[in-house]
Amino acid sequence: MKEEKSEKESKVKKKISKIIGTITVACVLMMTAGCGIMGMGSKSWIEKQVSDIEKVYPTENPEDLFEKFPNGFRIEQMRLFEENGKSYSISLEMKGDKETRKIEGKVSRVRLESKPYKETVEKESKVEYIKDKGLVLAKSELTDELLPKNYFLFQKLKLNTNALKKLEVKDKSFSFETGKYNIKYLFINKEIDNYLELNKQKVSLDIIGRYTEKNKIYFHSVIIEKATELYFSEKVVEEKGK
């Protein structure tokens, strides 16, 4: 009986040892994988993700984007401002068509109301980028109201890894769920001053992108803010190939 009991105990101990061994290996694997994941979201990791922003910033001739993005691209801009105590946005949406090689879209001036939230398009026009002329409205009489500038910010603003590393970082974030990341810098820039009609004022420049392992495309938004007085965003997105 004692021998039988001892044999059973030995078998139980062996099973427990195997279970413990399996758990230990799993923990080691998880820790190893975790070390790789932990780098995601760090300042250096985010800076690496945004390093290809120099692919667009600057691009003096927007038509050159067709060479960089053969499947076409989208350009979006948004300005928020107040006028006579009312809130407005100027929204620009354009598409670089790979077939026609044209960059066309529309620009709208929209009245914004909060209670309840409501958007009212007050003025709108088709817009096209024409080389040597810049952004040209179909309704030229609305140019002053719909086009504060007749060119894109990315035509003038230079952003690259070396330049960004010299800037003060205000904030950064990364979402494991969505893959969305952003890094926010504080600085004064002549091209931004000229584009947004500022006077050597420090602004925050927020670069936003989305990380994915598959079907990687260029996707960056640049958001410029100054307290509550200024909000401007410009987004360039590469179209996916079929």
Segments predicted by a language model, with ranges:
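N-terminal leader/targeting segments and the immediate start of mature chains
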Residues: M31-E82
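Generic short beta-strand segments
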Residues: E76-F81, V110, K184-I192
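Extended lipid/amphipathic-ligand handling interfaces
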Residues: I90-K98, L205-T212
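An acidic-aromatic
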Residues: E93-P148
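Flexible, processing/modification-adjacent segments and terminal tails
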Residues: E128-E177
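Extended beta-strand-rich segments in extracellular/periplasmic secretory proteins, especially
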Residues: L159-Y211
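Acidic, serine/threonine-rich low-complexity disordered tracts
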Residues: Q201-K242
